[in-house]
């Protein structure tokens, strides 16, 4: 956001888009006004809405959670080297040490709009499965966020309309992939759509049940695979 504002972009928070009309120019309608643009980018990832129903059926929002322990007296017993680790479970766990020897641990997911009341308890269970010696170590911080996944865990690049583009469904790898997607979208708007057109050919099936029933069906499936 700071980088965008530094080159002249204006950001309007709490201004939800209620409809998008293709152009040229494209029109984005809000409750109190409208914006004109040569291109509209749908960059809502796990927050897809009725503005883009065909793509919302292909990107499932899930919530992921992390905790930080108190500084560890013997961090080398947890990780011998300063590396980040992720396992290969269907609902994966991932962790690393911070500069002040806290264990930053991510694990546990939920589906739908609600977060668990106690994120500490949600994440402590998988943490203790991997590191039982940390069962009595205090957890000092807990947080979470909503991301978007696809059925094949590959990002979704698509043309929503002649002058509407979308990139989403980074499936837990958005720190790296979202920046790359931004470059590809910028290239496309500037007139070079070669990489966008290539990536848009990646098959991205809709989730069973579409946008309305994907949540309950996905919850059952993820619970089964997590066993």
Regions found by a protein language model. Give the residues of each.
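Hydrophobic residues embedded in beta-strands of well-ordered beta-sheets
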Residues: 26-28, 102-103, 164-165
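Thr-Gly-centered strand-to-loop micro-motif
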Residues: 30-31, 106-107, 167
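C-terminal catalytic lobe of FAD-dependent flavoproteins
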Residues: 109-226
């Amino acid at each position: 956001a700071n980088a965008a504002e530094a080159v002249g972009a204006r950001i309007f928070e709490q201004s939800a888009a209620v409809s998008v009309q293709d152009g040229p120019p494209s029109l984005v309608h809000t409750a109190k006004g409208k914006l004109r643009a040569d291109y509209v980018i749908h960059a809502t990832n796990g927050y897809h809405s009725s503005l883009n129903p065909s793509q919302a059926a292909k990107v499932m929002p899930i919530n992921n959670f992390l905790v930080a322990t108190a500084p560890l007296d013997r961090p080398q017993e947890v990780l011998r080297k300063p590396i980040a680790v992720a396992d290969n479970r269907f609902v994966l766990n991932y962790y690393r040490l911070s500069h002040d020897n806290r264990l930053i641990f991510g694990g546990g997911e939920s589906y739908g709009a609600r977060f668990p009341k106690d994120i500490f308890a949600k994440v402590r269970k998988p943490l203790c499965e991997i590191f039982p010696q940390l069962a009595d170590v205090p957890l000092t911080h807990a947080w979470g966020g909503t991301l978007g996944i696809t059925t094949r865990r590959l990002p979704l690049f698509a043309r929503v309309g002649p002058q509407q583009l979308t990139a989403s469904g980074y499936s837990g790898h958005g720190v790296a992939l979202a920046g790359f997607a931004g470059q590809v979208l910028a290239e496309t708007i500037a007139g070079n759509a070669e990489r966008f057109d290539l990536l848009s050919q990646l098959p991205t099936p809709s989730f069973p049940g579409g946008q309305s029933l994907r949540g309950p069906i996905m919850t059952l499936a993820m619970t089964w695979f997590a066993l």
